[in-house]
Amino acid sequence: MSDIQAKEDAAPVDRQSSSSVVVPDEPSPLRKMISVASIAAGIQFGWALQLSLLTPYVQLLGVPHKWSSFIWLCGPISGLLVQPTVGYFSDRCKSRFGRRRPFIATGALLVALAVILIGFAADFGHTMGDKLDEAVKIRAVGFFVVGFWILDVANNTLQGPCRAFLGDLAAGDAKKTRTANAIFSFFMAVGNVLGYAAGSYTNLHKIFPFTVTKACDIYCANLKSCFIISITLLIVLTIIALWYVEDKQWSPNADSDNEKTPFFGEIFGAFKVMKRPMWMLLAVTALNWIAWFPFLLYDTDWMGREVYGGDSAGDDKMKKLYNHGIQVGSLGLMLNSIVLGVMSLVIGVISKKIGAKRLWGAVNIILAVCLAMTVLVTKKAEEHRKIAGRMALPTNAIRDGALSLFAILGIPLAITFSIPFALASIISSSSGAGQGLSLGVLNMAIVIPQMIVSFGVGPIDALFGGGNLPGFVVGAIAALISSVVALTVLP
């Protein structure tokens, strides 16, 4: 990625007008950046639990498989609305506690509220009148959905100000800025590994015996215990960072321009003047996320439903089989995060040798193949159950094959989290556009496809029998198309 690196080293960090950026006299010490970046571990711990456990959990509460994807709509919606809005207002916050710390503290408190609503949804629903033998626990689902949406809003409230705080601490130093973001990414990987490890441990509820209740079985209690650990970690890291790291109070300069175009006005205005290279980048990014999102939504559900043959709406034996698959799926996600972290360390070296767009195109082929291979793994698991019996666990070969797919997918996921943003920076630098504005436009190419998938993947799966494979196949096709587009039209 020599072209990217050269432009990053040559170009100064984008300093916006004095109305939105406070630049300290000099960069803060590395230990303060580490303290702020460590909050990412707490954020990502909870996000890992969301990805691995919450889709199966809401089905255990009675929400049909085909409708569960609609609950995930808040993620892309809040990414589209909340994060840029919070960023816009945190740039202009005049609180005596600083610009970033009030938003980070608010986000952490919202996470705590959301975790209580999600973890105790079954208990709250039972207290409010849900019967234990009801197929759909309406009140519990209501508490869950409210908590789930609050959690997505809270995560977006936290992440933007945390990254902005790191930018403030870097004080415009390009090397410090790259280092701070690398540390943030490292702690994201740490949080992922911890979250998926916790989600794959089946006896976590024994640490918190009060989590098992009449309305909350062992799977539910494990989820509740995971979230208790998650919020404890986040609150501790947040308190340490906000106490230890100073966030200077901001006040606008007397000559600053207070009649600025609002953030969304800038975003939509950018589309009018956007040049072809950026449009092509948006197209590849959108196709890439259409490929990824069905798997991110239903990866552990696939393991519990198709690979292990369980059923979240079945009898106790089928539920136990399903939950077993979910736990193994969480292990797969942990392996995915480990590979992602390792791959993130070598992206720069590989990109320098073959180029960013070739690397992105190549790993999208890997993504397409892995998503297509889920069909083969599923068919092998079904054939095994026909021979060994409906309740038979998958063979070691089938289980290891599924886990291998999770691990290998860490390679293209690492590229998805880095190359598009690097290319957006290059294009914006060459065209004279602002870095923040270009990344805001790129974010729309991520969240809008996620909303499309959230609306469409459940009904598509239901149309073809109610499993997860149709969505994965659509993802494989989108990944293949994105690979071709990346290799042929990206600059």
Swiss-Prot record:
It is a multi-pass membrane protein. One of its GO terms (molecular function) is arbutin transmembrane transporter activity. Widely expressed. It holds the Pfam family MFS_1. CDD domains: MFS_SLC45_SUC (cd17313). It is found in: Cell membrane. The chain crosses the membrane at residues 34-54, 69-89, 102-122, 140-160, 182-202, 225-245, 278-298, 330-350, 359-379, 407-427, 444-464, 469-489. Disruption phenotype: Early flowering phenotype under short-day conditions. It catalyses: sucrose(out) + H(+)(out) = sucrose(in) + H(+)(in). GO terms for cellular component: plasma membrane. Residues 1-12 have a biased composition (Basic and acidic residues). Residues 55-68, 123-139, 203-224, 299-329, 380-406, 465-468 are extracellular. Pathway: Glycan biosynthesis; sucrose metabolism. Residues 1-26 are annotated as: Disordered. InterPro entries: MFS, MFS_trans_sf, Suc_symporter_pln. Residues 1-33, 90-101, 161-181, 246-277, 351-358, 428-443, 490-491 are cytoplasmic. One of its GO terms (biological process) is glucoside transport. Keywords: Cell membrane, Membrane, Phosphoprotein, Sugar transport, Symport, Transmembrane, Transmembrane helix, Transport. High-affinity sucrose transporter. Responsible for the transport of sucrose into the cell, with the concomitant uptake of protons (symport system). Can also transport a wide range of glucosides, such as helicin, salicin, arbutin, maltose, fraxin, esculin, uranose, alpha-methylglucoside, alpha-phenylglucoside and beta-phenylglucoside. Plays a role in flowering time transition delay. Belongs to the glycoside-pentoside-hexuronide (GPH) cation symporter transporter (TC 2.A.2.4) family. This is Sucrose transport protein SUC9. It comes from Arabidopsis thaliana.
